[in-house]
Amino acid sequence: MAKTLPIMFQGTHSDAGKSVIATAFCRMFAQDGWKTAPFKSQNMSLNSYVTPDGNEIGRAQGIQAEAAGVAARAEMNPILIKPSREHESQIVVLGKPYGNMQAFAYRNEFFHQGLAVIRQSLETLMNEYDRIVIEGAGSPAEVNLNDRELVNMRVARLANAPVVLIGDIERGGVFASLVGTLALLEPEDRKRVVGVIINKFRGDAALLKPGLDWFEQYTGVPVLGVVPHLPDLAIDAEDSLALERFAASSDDKGAIDIAVIRCPKIANFTDIDPLLTEPDCRVRLVTHAGELGEPDVIVLPGSKNTIEDLMYMKKRGLASRIVSLVNEGKTTVVGLCGGYQMLGDVIRDPHGVETPFPEVKGLGLLPVATTLERTKTTVRSEGMLTWAGERFSVRGYEIHMGRSTPLPGYVPLIEIGGRGEGAKREDGRVLGTYMHDLFHNDAFRTAFFNVIRREKGLASSAVRPFHSLKEAAFDRLAAHVRQHVAVERIEQMMRQFQQR
């Protein structure tokens, strides 16, 4: 049996493109016939993914597993950190909530336990897969943190993995960041760096060549590729920094205006990704009432702290403005997970799960009352949804720590196993659900927006299959990276590294 070969991608800073490059290698290895697993020891993100067996991991590793054509599992991201309050995060270990911890306590009290979980998860994957594509986090040169870090060079040592360092040229100063990172590494760790990739390049590659030659001569580290910027890649983003790029690139020409409310604790914002594929829709992020206008659709995404985000909306005039627009019949509101909880009459927090406030009034647009609980629900779900006189099969996943109970006038949105899930107004102007990926259901998404189109006198649209768009995006990304990165050379380095 051939030995498992790992490769690790680290970056000079956050958002250098580690996740995308790792996704490309997952796809390429799978295309070449290797059973491949992604791995990120510790991920800090509010964008998560539910595995088929009901465990919660970082969204990036779930998407990378999809790119590799394998089922996602908890070992692919054994530790997930979900910021919930100032200086406090929920720690998820092997897909299940471990508890809430402050940063100092996590670093000082959890280190050895975390390291043991990471080591065991890595060993499990290396016993079952041919290739392990490992992603680091932030920078490996954080000298103030490296004595107890759990995600960069310590993981490379555990896996005995060669490291490819990624620099983001889009931000400027790419050679300084690459050279500086290499200079700050411990000598033994620096020996693990077999090459660098320069990511997000725009312009004439000939102008970059003198810099590449200088870098290789100065450091002795080869440049393994220069990856040009790849626009309109329909693959879920994980980093909140991606929201900044999304906001900056939103098309203002769409006939259907969709306002996504961006609160400070926004979570699982990939729920809106399919909306970006609708050719006549303009999707924009809104943070206060002055930006809202009179959109056709308002989306309230998930939240890691629903009460804080609801209070944020009230303070910025968004809550009252949304209620007015709905009551005037000028908009349709969709609440997803935390957004659904906000649409109800009240949110109760008797155990102080999110805030010291025992009860907060909701927007009062749906007849439900929510009680936040200590236990978390993480499950994949499937049911039937009736919309515009048609019944649709819908599937998605739930991640929440609350229970919403019906009040008089309640109408369920989805039927799941004989029970009602979510809620809707009979006029269809307000709907809410705990089901993430609702708009990933192509037939329902098309029917939902066709109602809006008819109201605006627009032609109905045919179904656009989002899943096939994502599969095509994986292939497009893999082809792009194959063209611009010395993939065969990296594979040779992986084999040679194991012979040291």
Swiss-Prot record:
PROSITE patterns tied to this protein: GATASE_COBBQ
Pathway terms, separated by semicolons: Cofactor biosynthesis; adenosylcobalamin biosynthesis
Active site as annotated: 337, 436
CDD domains in the record: CobQ_N (cd05389), GATase1_CobQ (cd01750)
Record keywords: Cobalamin biosynthesis, Glutamine amidotransferase
Gene3D superfamilies noted in UniProt: 3.40.50.880, P-loop containing nucleotide triphosphate hydrolases (3.40.50.300)
Pfam families: CbiA, GATase_3
InterPro entries, alphabetized: Class_I_gatase-like (IPR029062), CobQ/CobB/MinD/ParA_Nub-bd_dom (IPR002586), CobQ_GATase1 (IPR033949), CobQ_N (IPR047045), CobQ_synth (IPR004459), GATase_3 (IPR011698), P-loop_NTPase (IPR027417)
Chain ranges of the GATase cobBQ-type domain: 255-444
MF (Gene Ontology): ABC-type vitamin B12 transporter activity; catalytic activity
GO biological process, one term: cobalamin biosynthetic process
NCBIfam families: cobQ (TIGR00313), PRK00784.1 (NF001989)
PANTHER family tied to this protein: COBYRIC ACID SYNTHASE, DETHIOBIOTIN SYNTHETASE
Job description of the protein: Catalyzes amidations at positions B, D, E, and G on adenosylcobyrinic A,C-diamide. NH(2) groups are provided by glutamine, and one molecule of ATP is hydrogenolyzed for each amidation.
Family affiliation: Belongs to the CobB/CobQ family. CobQ subfamily.
Protein name, as recorded: Cobyric acid synthase
The species this protein was found in: Geobacillus thermodenitrificans (strain NG80-2)
Lineage: Bacteria, Bacillati, Bacillota, Bacilli, Bacillales
